[in-house]
Regions:
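Conserved short hydrophobic patches within well-ordered secondary structure
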Residues: 79-81, 106, 128-129
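Flexible loop residues that form catalytic
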Residues: 36, 105, 133
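A short acidic, helix-capping loop that chelates divalent metal ions and anchors anionic groups
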Residues: 137-142
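A short SAM/SAH-binding and catalytic strip from SAM-dependent methyltransferases
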Residues: 101-111
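Conserved beta-strand signature within the Rossmann-like core of class I S-adenosyl-L-methionine
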Residues: 125-135
């Protein structure tokens, strides 16, 4: 059912695209891809803006994974080179990636699993673009029939201080809730 597919906040879109255009990756893994926003936008700004319009001329490998079986649509099959229905906590990468995009994912697991997942991504990727709700007010159960949408951990910007952050943006929603974007080197 399309109503239970995960999505990401609006606050991350421009920042993530700026980071991707700066890195110029040849491979991307979209963690918790949901509707496919990052795959779609990466194709637009890394391929189409480089005048590679035909799918057979694309040079950037973009793979996706999502735990929710309701995620997959024909859009995913077109945009992504491969798409896996798997929980990132049990996923074993088959290759290194230049960039992992992991926005609005870590809060859906307990803090220990979130930190392990981040460690895994940093071990397998040169860059991790992380978006995560910060502070109080984000707690919620799953919704629209999707138990994977429950927020199970509260994150703070200080949780990420030990990592090699090259860029970050802290912002707030229209409701005053905190949100952080972090470009972390693997």
């Amino acid at each position: 059912m399309a109503g239970d597919i995960g999505t990401s906040t609006l606050y991350s879109t421009e920042w993530v695209i700026e980071q991707l255009r700066e890195v110029k990756p040849s491979s991307i893994i979209d963690i918790g891809c949901g509707w496919g926003r990052w795959g779609f936008l990466a194709r637009e700004f890394l391929e189409l803006w480089s005048h590679r319009f035909a799918r057979d001329s694309w040079k950037v490998r973009i793979d996706a994974l999502d735990v929710n079986p309701s995620t997959w649509t024909p859009v995913h099959a077109y945009i992504y080179d491969s798409a896996l229905q798997v929980d990132v906590r049990t996923w074993v990468p088959s290759q290194r990636y230049d960039v992992a995009i992991c926005c609005d994912v870590l809060e859906h697991m307990d803090k220990e699993d979130g930190l392990k997942t981040l460690g895994k991504l940093l071990a397998w990727c040169d860059h991790v673009l992380l978006g995560v709700p910060l502070g109080a007010g984000w707690e919620r159960p799953g919704f629209d029939g999707n138990p994977y949408e429950a927020h199970l951990a509260r994150w703070e910007a200080s949780d990420l201080e030990p990592y090699n952050i090259t860029a970050h943006k802290l912002t707030q929603t229209e409701d005053g809730l905190g949100y952080g974007l972090f470009h972390i080197l693997g």
